[in-house]
Amino acid sequence: MYRLISSIASKARVARNCTSQIGSRLSSTRNYAAKDIRFGVEGRALMLRGVEELADAVKVTIPPKGRNVIIEQSWGAPKVTKDGVTVAKSIEFKDRVKNVGASLVKQVANRPTQLNRCLGDGTTCATVLTRAIFTEGCKSVAAGMNAMDLRRGIKLAVDTVVTKLKSRARMISTSEEIAQVGTISANGDRELVTDCKAMESVGKEGVITIQDGKTLFNELEVVEGMKIDRGYISPYFITNQKNQKCELEDPLILIHEKKISNLNSMVKVLELALKSQRSLLIVAADLESDALAVLILNKLRAGIKVCAVKAPGFGENRKANMHDLATLTGAQVITEELGMNLEKIDLSMLGNCKKITVSKDDTVFLGWGAGDKKAIGERCEQIRSMVEASESDYDKEKLQERLAKLSGGVAVLKIGGASESEVGEKKDRVTDALNATKAAVEEGIVPGGGVALLYASKELDKLSTANFDHKIGVQIIQNALKTPVYTIASNAGVEGAVIVGKLLESDNPDLGYDAAKGEYVDMVKSGIIDPVKVIRTALVDAASVSSLLTTTEAVVTEIPTKEDASPAMGGGGGGMGGMGGMGGMGF
C-alpha cells in the first residue's frame, strides 16, 4: 500500500512539474499589448490637437486662392497638390491619441460613397467644419454642459440647415452652369474644366474616366458605343499592323458564356461567317488552345477576318456584362444551362454592329445593329432598380458602369503636363471638378463661396430648444457655419471676420465675397456656385464626427513596445551592430 501511495505521489509531482513547465513556456510565448487610457478632458484635448493640425494643413487648399501642399512620399518624388483629400490622407501623428482624433476626421474624406468619389471638394469643407464644431463642443463640455444634450442640439440645428439648403436649391442643365461648378472645384482653373464637354457627350449616366495624357495638353476622347476592358487573346488577330489593332467592319458577334473547347463547333461558326462573307468576333469566358489554333489558322490561311476576346469581369458580373452586350448587339448568349450549344447555332443567334476595334487592352463596339431599343430601355430600367436596391458600394459602382455603357457612352479625359508631379496635381483637381459637377446635376446648386451656409445660420435664430444645453448645441453649429467664408477670405489675405460681419448685415441671400477679385458680388450671376449635395453632406458628416468626438469620455490606445536591440555580430567593431536600433520604429 505504501509503495502504491508513493508511486501515485511521485507521478503527481512529475505532473505538477510538467504543468508548471508548460505554463511557463505558454506565458513566455504570449504577447500582451499594453494599453494607455486617457479620460475626459485630457483625452478630448489631445484628439482636438490632432484635428486642429490636420485641419490647418487642409484648409490652405480651399479655393479660389488655395495654396499648394507638398507631401513627402516613401517612394518617388514629393507630391504637390491642392486637393484637401490627398493632404488629409497623408497625415499621421506619432502621438496615438492625436492620431485617433485625426483618423476619425479622415474617415469623412475617405468615405468613397459620399465624399471622396462623388463629392469632390466637399471633404475640405467638411474638415474645416469638423474642427469648428469639435473645438466649441470641447469648450462647452469642459464648462459643465451635458455632452448628450449638446449632441441633440447639434442634430436639431443641422436638420434645420439641410432643409433650408434643399429649399433654396436651383437645378442646373446648361454646359455653362456645369463649367462654373467645375471651375470652383478645380481651384479656379477654367482650362482644367473639360468635364462639361464630356457630360454633354455621354449624358448624365455616362462614364467619364480620367487618365494620364501623353502630351502637354488636356484631351477629351469620347467613345460613342460600348467599351470593354479586354483585348485580343492573340496578336495573330491583328489586321492593322500600323496601330496594332484588329478592325472588323460589319461583323457577326458570337457571345458564349463558357470556355470554348469543341473544335467541330468552332468550324460550324466559321462556316456561317464564310457563307455570309462577314467578319466574326467571338466573346467567351476563354478558349482552349486547340480552338484558338483553329481560329488563327483560318485567319492566316483562309483569310477569314476573325478575332476572339475574353468576356470582361468575373463570376456573376461577367455573366451580366455578357447579357448587356447581347442586348445591345441583338445576339443571344450561348449558355449550356438553357440547352444551347454551338453545333446548333444559326445566324439569328449572332449579333452585329457597324464596327469593332480591338486593341491589346480593350474592345470598342461602335454603332449598334440588331439591338432592340425597347429591350435596351427595359434593361437600363432594371439596372437602375438594382442600383437603388444595392447596399454595397462596389456593386453600385459596377452597376453604374454597366448602365453608362448601355445608355450613355464613355468619355476619357487625358490630362497632360510637363512632369509627372504636374499631371498628378492636375488630375486631383479635375477629379474634384468632375465629382462636384455630377453632384450639382443630381441635387442642384446654391450660391457658393460658403454664403449658403452663412445665410442658413440666420434660420437658427428662430429655432426653439428644450433646454439651455440644446441651445448651446444650436449655437455651436451657428458659429461653425461661418467658418467656410472666414477661411476663404483668410486664404485670400483679407480679414475673415470683417467679411462675415458685412455679409450677415445683408438681406440679399445671393450676395457673397469673390475672393479672386476681392469684391462683393452676386454669387449666382458671377458663376460662383456650390452643389447642394456637396455642402449638405459635408455638414452632416462634420456634425456626426464632431458629436462622436465631443461625447467621448475615454480613449484607449496601444503603448508602442521597443524591440530589444539585436546583438552585434561577433568581432564586428561598428557597422552592422548599429542596426539594432532599427527595432524601435514604433509610432
From Swiss-Prot:
As for subcellular location, the record says: Mitochondrion
* SUPFAM superfamilies tied to this protein: GroEL apical domain-like, GroEL equatorial domain-like, GroEL-intermediate domain like
Role played: Implicated in mitochondrial protein import and macromolecular assembly. May facilitate the correct folding of imported proteins. May also prevent misfolding and promote the refolding and proper assembly of unfolded polypeptides generated under stress conditions in the mitochondrial matrix.
Q: Where is the transit peptide?
A: 1-32
Homology family: Belongs to the chaperonin (HSP60) family.
Q: What is the lineage of its organism?
A: Eukaryota, Viridiplantae, Streptophyta, Embryophyta, Tracheophyta
Q: Give UniProt keywords alphabetically.
A: ATP-binding, Chaperone, Mitochondrion, Nucleotide-binding, Stress response, Transit peptide
**GO terms for molecular function, please?**
ATP binding; ATP-dependent protein folding chaperone
Q: Which Gene3D superfamilies match?
A: GroEL, GroEL-like equatorial domain, TCP-1-like chaperonin intermediate domain
**InterPro entries linked to this entry:** Chaperonin_Cpn60_CS, Cpn60/GroEL, Cpn60/GroEL/TCP-1, GroEL-like_apical_dom_sf, GROEL-like_equatorial_sf, TCP-1-like_intermed_sf
Q: Which CDD domains match?
A: GroEL (cd03344)
In the record, biological process GO terms are: protein refolding
The source's superkingdom equals Eukaryota
Name by which UniProt lists this protein:
Chaperonin CPN60, mitochondrial
Q: Name one GO cellular component term.
A: mitochondrion
Instruction: List the NCBIfam families.
Output: GroEL (TIGR02348), PRK00013.1 (NF000592), PRK12849.1 (NF009487), PRK12850.1 (NF009488), PRK12851.1 (NF009489)
